[in-house]
Amino acid sequence: MKKFLIIGGGAMGSAFTIPCLENKNDVVITEPYSKKFIKELSSKRKYHSALKMNLPKKLKFRKYSGDLLKEKFDLIVIALSLPGIDFIGKELKKNNINTPLLVLTKGLKYISRSKKIFTISEKLQKVSGIKNISVLKGPCLAKELARKHQTSVIIANKNINFAKKIGKRISTKYYLNEF
């Protein structure tokens, strides 16, 4: 993997770009909702108010659109808040995207009609139809990651070799991962 699209310009999505860029990946970040983050990420300084720091100059910001989703990426990283999961799932399906996903979003989704609880990856798979979905979980705070404090995460996928492939592209001395 080399070209990543990160959807979600909040604290975790933006912090996650740092180890990705350090591993020489081509990283594009986009933000579908927050005008504040859109303004910050598209500026020359790339100052992120939630992280209270400038993001790397190599980070590319692109305006969110269906056309952006259709571009060739090796991995799409979902870093939206829980309410954005349905939106992005529908967008991925509408644009016929089948790129592997890595989900950073934490939490569970309760569907009141069926009275069922879904993990975020289950919900995304159901809405988007994408089968290759990995999740990244762990005791990792965005500010710690952005400041390169040692932290660790677990990457899970039904195909452990694919999870390991992601791990190789994001692991650093301070950002450790297991599978």
Language-model segments: residues:
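NAD(P)+-binding Rossmann beta1-loop-alpha1 motif at the extreme N-terminus of oxidoreductases
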Residues: M1-N54, L59-K63, K70, I111, ...
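A structural micro-motif
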Residues: K2, N25, L59, T99, ...
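Hydrophobic beta-strand segments of well-ordered beta-sheets in folded domains
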Residues: F4, V27, P100-L102, T151-V153
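Conserved residues at beta->alpha junctions
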Residues: E31-P32, A79-L80, N157
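Rossmann-like NAD(P)(H) cofactor-binding subdomain of soluble oxidoreductases
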Residues: L55, R62-G66, E71-H149, A163-G167
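Conserved anion/nucleotide-ligand pocket segment
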Residues: K148-E178
